[in-house]
């Protein structure tokens, strides 16, 4: 009888190496936060208060930072808003702590950007709007001379900002939006990912000419398939040119509720799974603080950052020996503060032990009225279902992995 060769010994690592290794990038510092492939993926968001309202802006920045936004962006549409950033930064330091801040600058914004650069850690510009080209209805072509004149105007306008940021050791985001490409980009490339990439490249090459590389790039669109194509193309194009700048990921105008979260998870999560992306912002039409758990959830699902307990639970079926949904909620309520643990709650022994083999602890339906507790793959004890949650807590305590929940937490 023919026999098969013995397979290689299984890896001892609980998780396989990613199919796509992370895209190598430079490191860019935004205040005390480092963005790039050698560092954890950074979560950020943006306040929606008017920057001229100093107290409201400071409170909003603090709320976001406390919620887990490691970098906070503010809109700076005028010179008055730019000057207000000095007071905002000062009050943050006095009443809270320094927070890495990004100023969002758009239409013909060079004077605003130069002013605000001294008060923030990063300036974000939109290439489609920074040197605004007045559209000409009925235009049928751009001459080479016209294109060269626009490029020269961009270089002349943009270079002082690059030099200022370089001198101050600040960062820049070249943030392209699919919905605001310049007219000539639309004329040459259409409303396409190619136009988005070329729009960013035009500005990035000026940065490289000035030997300024504290640059982050983004290529956002409201449709995940467009942003996916743009980021993939950008990774190939920029890396081929040696401009391996970090990428800021996001689906802009994702909407609200469940569908907004799904769109963000599809767009951001797909790229992260491919090794593309170094900082993320989930954009929801909701209070900005609600974006943060979604962002960390995406990172946890991909095993990129662990900020909560990982619960493994089956969907339930006719073999389930207890109310799985109810028990999962009880287990979660008792253990959700034990960040770093993987806990499985499985309804029966058919798939339970195998499906939860890489969990730290398992709670599995054994026979009617009884459950088994596991430590990894090892069955530790069988207890009445009514004692299951407390027995799980005692097992975790016996292993020295229990900590008391913080005061006021749901686990307390």
Curated annotation (Swiss-Prot):
Cofactor list: [4Fe-4S] cluster
Alphabetic keyword roster: 4Fe-4S, Iron, Iron-sulfur, Isoprene biosynthesis, Metal-binding, Oxidoreductase
The keyword Electron transport is annotated on this UniProt entry: no
Source taxon at top rank: Bacteria
Region (Disordered): 1-22
Protein name (Swiss-Prot/TrEMBL): 4-hydroxy-3-methylbut-2-en-1-yl diphosphate synthase (ferredoxin)
Membership in a protein family: Belongs to the IspG family.
Binding of [4Fe-4S] cluster, residues: 314, 317, 348, 355
One GO biological process term: terpenoid biosynthetic process
Source organism of this protein record: Synechococcus sp. (strain JA-3-3Ab) (Cyanobacteria bacterium Yellowstone A-Prime)
NCBIfam families in the record: ispG_gcpE, PRK00366.1
Pathway per the UniProt entry: Isoprenoid biosynthesis; isopentenyl diphosphate biosynthesis via DXP pathway; isopentenyl diphosphate from 1-deoxy-D-xylulose 5-phosphate: step 5/6
Cofactor-binding details, from the entry: Binds 1 [4Fe-4S] cluster.
Bridged cysteine pairs (disulfide): none
InterPro entries, sorted: Dihydropteroate_synth-like_sf, IspG_bac, IspG_bac-typ, NO2/SO3_Rdtase_4Fe4S_sf
Signal peptide extent: none
A GO MF term: 4-hydroxy-3-methylbut-2-en-1-yl diphosphate synthase activity (ferredoxin)
Enzyme Commission code: 1.17.7.1
Composition-biased stretches (Polar residues): 1-12
Function: Converts 2C-methyl-D-erythritol 2,4-cyclodiphosphate (ME-2,4cPP) into 1-hydroxy-2-methyl-2-(E)-butenyl 4-diphosphate.
Lineage, broadest ranks: Bacteria, Bacillati, Cyanobacteriota, Cyanophyceae, Synechococcales
Swiss-Prot/TrEMBL catalytic activity: (2E)-4-hydroxy-3-methylbut-2-enyl diphosphate + 2 oxidized [2Fe-2S]-[ferredoxin] + H2O = 2-C-methyl-D-erythritol 2,4-cyclic diphosphate + 2 reduced [2Fe-2S]-[ferredoxin] + H(+)
């Amino acid at each position: 009888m023919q026999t098969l060769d013995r397979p290689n010994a299984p890896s001892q690592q609980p998780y396989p190496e990613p199919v796509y290794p992370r895209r190598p990038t430079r490191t860019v510092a935004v205040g005390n936060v480092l963005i790039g492939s050698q560092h954890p993926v950074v979560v950020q968001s943006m306040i929606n208060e008017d920057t001229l309202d100093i107290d409201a802006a400071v409170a909003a920045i603090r709320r976001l930072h406390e919620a887990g936004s490691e970098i906070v962006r503010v809109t700076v549409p005028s010179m008055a808003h730019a000057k207000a950033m000095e007071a905002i930064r000062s009050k943050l330091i006095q009443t809270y702590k320094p927070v890495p801040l990004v100023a969002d600058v758009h239409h013909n914004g060079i004077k605003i950007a130069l002013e605000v650069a001294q008060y923030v850690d990063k300036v974000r510009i939109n290439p489609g709007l920074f040197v605004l080209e007045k559209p000409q209805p009925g235009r049928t072509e751009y001459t080479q001379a016209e294109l060269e004149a626009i490029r020269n105007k961009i270089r002349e306008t943009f270079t002082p900002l690059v030099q200022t940021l370089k001198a101050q050791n600040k960062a820049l985001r070249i943030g392209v939006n699919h919905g605001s490409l310049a007219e000539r980009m639309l004329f040459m490339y259409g409303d396409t990912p190619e136009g988005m990439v070329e729009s960013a490249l035009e500005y990035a090459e000026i940065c490289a000419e000035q030997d300024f590389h504290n640059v982050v790039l983004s290529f956002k669109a409201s449709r995940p398939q467009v942003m996916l194509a743009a980021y993939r193309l950008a990774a190939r194009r920029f890396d081929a040119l040696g401009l391996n700048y970090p990428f800021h990921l996001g689906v802009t105008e994702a909407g609200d509720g469940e569908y907004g979260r799904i769109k963000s998870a599809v767009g951001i999560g797909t790229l992260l799974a491919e090794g593309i992306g170094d900082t993320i912002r989930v954009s929801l039409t909701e209070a900005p603080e609600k974006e943060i758990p979604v962002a960390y959830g995406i990172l946890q699902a991909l095993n990129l950052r662990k900020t909560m307990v990982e619960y493994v639970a089956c969907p339930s079926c006719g073999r389930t020996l207890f109310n799985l949904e109810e028990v999962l909620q009880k287990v979660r309520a008792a253990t959700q503060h034990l960040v770093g643990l993987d806990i499985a709650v499985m309804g029966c022994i058919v798939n339970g032990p195998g499906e939860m083999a890489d969990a730290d602890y398992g709670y599995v339906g054994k026979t009617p009225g009884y459950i088994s507790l596991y430590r990894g793959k090892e069955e530790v004890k069988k207890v009445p279902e009514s004692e299951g949650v407390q027995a799980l807590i005692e097992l975790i305590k016996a292993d020295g992995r229990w900590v008391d929940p913080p005061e006021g937490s749901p686990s307390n």
